[in-house]
Each structure stands twice: as C-alpha cells, then as structure tokens.
Amino acid sequence: MSFSVASRVSYFGTTIFAEMTQLAIQHNAINLSQGFPDFDGPSDVKAAAIAAVEAGQNQYAPPNGQPDLRRAIAVHAQRFYGQAVNSDTEITVTSGATEALFAAVTGLINPGHEVVIFEPFYDSYVPDVIMAGGVPRFVPLRPVKHALRERSVEGAQPVLSDSEGSKDAIDWVFDPDELAAAFNNRTRAIIVNTPHNPTGKVYSQAELETIAGLCQRWNVIAISDEVYEHIVFSGVQHVRLAQLPGMAERTVTISSQGKTFSFTGWKIGWAIAPPDLTLGVRRTHQFITFASSTPMQAAAAYALALDDEYYSTLAADYQHKRDFLAAVLRDAGLHVSIPDGTYFIMAGIAPLGFDDDVAFCRYLTTEIGVAAIPPSAFYSDEHKSLGQAYARFAFCKKQETLERAAERLMRLKKQ
C-alpha cells in the first residue's frame, strides 16, 4: 500500500538545488551551483556562539526572538538605512529568511489573493504562495543590452561580446507597463528581491519608486527579500524598499545573517514590518518553528555590531571573486552578465552551442566537473525560455576552489 502526498504539495518536486548538489557529489564536481560558502565567517562571531552555549543559553528563546538580537536588528536598520524600528513590535526572528518568507506569505495572504512575483525568482516564492491558496502573477525581468557602464573585471575586458562582435553589457529589467498590468483589485502583495538572485541585479531607486507607486495605488503589501543587502559592488547602492515614502507601513523587509556573515547553516533570519503586518508573521511563525536557535541568536546580535570595515571588506572580497570567475567564464567561451550584487553570475551558454540550460548544467557537472544551476527552474512555464540560454554560477567559494574550477572550465574551450 502507498499513500499520495497532500494536493497542496503535489505540484512541487525536488528543488533544483538539491538535484544539482547530489549530481555534483556523484561526479565529484566542484559545486558552484548552490549558494553556500565553503569557508567560515568571522572567528569572533563563532566565538560568540560558543560563549553563548557555554554560558547556558541553550533553552528556548522567546518566540519573537531574543531581545538583544531584536535590538541589534533595529540598530542595524537605523545605522545603514536611517530606518526607525521598534524592536518589540516590529521585528520577528525566524529560522532563516526562508521561514520569514513563508511566515509572511502564510500570515498575510488569503485564498484567491494574487501575488506579483518577478522572474527569475528564488524557488520558495511560488510554493509559499500556492500553499497559502494565493495565485502567482508573474512579471519577467528580461535581459537587455545597454551601453557599457564602467565595471572592474580583473583579467578581462569589461564588456560582453555578441556573435557580431558588438560590445554591450546586460541589465535585467522589467517593463513598467507589464508590471502595472499585473496589479488589480485581487492583488494582495508583491515579492521583491534586491539584490536579486539569480541575476545579480540591484534594483534602482527609480525602479523601486515604480513598484512603490503601484503598491500605494492598489493598497498592496510589499514583501522585500534583502538577504544580499551587503553584497553590492562598484559603488552600487542598495536601496531598502521600506525607505521610500509611503512604504514603511506596507513593507515586510526580510534579511538574515547567513549571507552577510557566511554562516548559512545557522539559519537565523528576521522580518521587519509594522505591527499589523508583524502580527501575521508572528502568528504563523509560532506554529512553524516556535523559536530559533538561542546561542546562534546571541552570535547574530554580536555580528550585526561589527564595524564598517567588516562590511566594506565583505563586498570587496566578493567583488574580487566575481571578477575572477567572470574572467574565467568569458575565457571559457560563455557570454557573461556582470552582477552588481549577490554572489551569483548568470552566463549565456549559446556561444558553446547549447540552447537548453538543464542539458548544459548536467553536461557541465558530469563531463567537465563543475556544477551550476539551470535558471529556467526559476521561471514560470510561460517564460521558462528566458532562462534556458543561461547557467548560474556561485562565487561564494575559497579562491583555491575557484581556481580549481577555472582549470576544469577551460576544458570547455577544447570541446
């Protein structure tokens, strides 16, 4: 006898991250697919976690989060964005940003509500909406060539060359009219991810103002996923959506310590929202995980207070890794889209004779020994073709790991 899964999850399969990681393990490939560092974050942050354990902070934390961490999150919001946040009523600590996303969607979306989602999207967005009974409305980010901006790419010309030899760079942009058409009286929320996984796009102030205007016109909640907030390059500024006029009262801002401090396994995230929206997050959170790891919360509070040098060095180190991998991918024959943020690079595979990202990533893993992610997994069926011409590579790795990957990627030139 066998049993079927619940209908609400029958739509879902194994995540592409799990699939590609398993394939990488089977073929002893270097894993540039999943976005986790192969190095630890700051040693003093680890020491803070150990000290918390040894001090006996090993029982349940308050469901909404340890007061010290909530205060640290509030101070961080003021320090970097000038955002005044009440740590008692407007901050909820969760087991990673993914739980914060689920809690926000589940706690604020009713069956039949529509949720606008940009694609490509982080792969939990759509399942979250569907499990809440919501209806996703997709708006694609399309790759558009534009005049070259100044970029620093070590060891390579900072340009993208198409088959005709023209020199252009790529932006991933939405059509404002297409976005406006996605809003209606059934629209309850929009999910915005900036800096954006997988494209590396950092939404401009003007783009965020367009989004904000539609949210206010249609009385829509914004769920802003900002986990890569401190990983931006070349003087590009990350603008928090809640900073814009009229948006603080309708925005759930989500972030975590995993990306900023390189401890993805600790799973400490948070949601900042006005009290009425926080209520929905907290009512859901209490019945998912109830509370998050107590000693890891103590360490996260310590980490958030690190000096400005830590944050600037983080971005500079990742920019160096970005530049190295971009040069390697270009030299290997791929068409590179230089990211302004995150630790991912989207690379066009057409110059290598591929038009199917899944086939390419499987070939790359099994034959070349480097794993990447096929980004078509981050699109709806309607727009899946937009992702099939690319592969996503993660550069959140030790330099020696990237150099070993580079040696293998050079085999592509010989194919």
Give, region by region, the residue ranges found by the protein language model.
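Conserved AMP-binding/adenylate-forming core of the ANL superfamily
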Residues: L69-I73, G96
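PLP-dependent class I/II
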Residues: S2-V5, S10-H27, F36-A52, N64, ...
